Amino acid sequence: MADIMESSDGTILRLPRIALVVPSLAEGGGVPAVARFVKDVVVRSGRYQLKLISLATSSRDSDSRRFVDPASWMRKVGTSTGIWEGLPFVHVGTVGAELEFQRYRPHAALARVVADCDVLQVVCGTPAWANAVCGLGKPVAVQCATRARVERRMRDSDPRSAGAWWRRAMTAITDRIDDRALRSVNSIQVENLWMLDYAKCINKNRQVDLRYAPPGVNAVDFHPLPTRDLDVDPYILCVARLSDPRKNIGLLLEAYAQLPVQLIQTVRLVLAGSSAPPAAFWVHVNALGLCDRVTYLPRPDRATLIALYQQAAVFALPSDEEGLGVVLLEAMACGVPAVATRCGGPDGIIADGEDGYLVDLDDAANMALRIGLLLSSHDANRKMGAKARMTVMKRYEEGVAGIAFLDIWDHLLSTRQNHI
């Protein structure tokens, strides 16, 4: 990527540098997927340089000072390099990595890494991560999906061990850091409407650039087939980290089991993702006599994933909590109608009854009803799938969604220059 450009009067100008700051960039999941979108926005624009920065998320992080590793006490916080999406990134450790809240604190090593950057764009699940780069003399934008207290409510609801109580205490501390970060950054981009309302409430006494700015979808790669054959081996698809309790995959199994017998006999349930459902799920599958009807595909590559979407009869998202639901957008981009719970992100994406269906949390009966409607009427299925594709093209296609980010960075740069 070129780092200079020539102005109309022949002056050579340095392109401003955007630091894309992401917790554990090399890991999979929703956050790196959003980071990939933001990275592409920067690269396609030709208006900025890009610097990728990965933050420590593990208590065993080798670049960090660790309380349990006396040999690390006297050395500086380290950095290491890697390649992500064909581009170099810098991984930065922290001080006291065993304590979650320490990972959200600014420190000298991180300040040195961002010193040559003009805008710091943080992409994260919960906004606490932005606190790590606040106060370093650079404008900070944070793109976030949820709050730690909301994201972890199922995990922390019934602590029964010392470790569980410890994690619950870390959540309480992180919740306060979430709020501090939202009050400190210069720009906030959220992925769902409830988080938009919360960020407005937190910032009611100050002016901040606050927007609903979800990531976009590559609608060229994720596209519908000319025709979907709903008669030959139809299946319901769910894509998720299926071991995560928040994905509530058991709800989808309950809904599937409540479908009319003739549909169960002809329509399979296909699950795909980076982690398999827990053992208890498969015990339940066996108890329901559905072993030959439920399939799990581990870690499908991109081409396989797109084909899974394109050929699905219905996409189902049974989650208890979703900051956005990128998989939902990918399915809709492929012209597949979706049934999703009102779990946060989908509430702002789907117009219920128009381009998909929304059902209440833990409502297996209504999920089964909506899925059954889409399986029983091919005409309704195709019409809703076409509307789903239109929704993505109007609001979530990556070029459309990227405009908000470019505008935010331009505004932060102009504001910074006015204060220099």
What are these regions (language model features)?
Residues 337-340:
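Short hydrophobic beta-strand element within catalytic cores of glycosyltransferases
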Residues 58-59, 239, 268-282:
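Glycosyltransferase donor-sugar binding loop
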Residues 320:
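Aromatic "clamp/platform" in nucleotide-sugar-dependent glycosyltransferases that forms part
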Residues 228-247, 253-256, 270:
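Conserved donor-binding/catalytic core segment of Leloir-type glycosyltransferases
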Residues 111, 165-188:
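Membrane-proximal helix-turn-helix segments that form the acceptor-binding/catalytic region
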Residues 299-300, 307-312:
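Short alpha-helical donor nucleotide-sugar binding micro-motif in glycosyltransferases
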Residues 282-303:
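Nucleotide-activated donor-binding/catalytic signature segment of Leloir-type glycosyltransferases, i.e.
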Residues 351-353, 357-364, 373-379:
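Conserved acidic donor-binding segment of nucleotide-sugar-dependent glycosyltransferases
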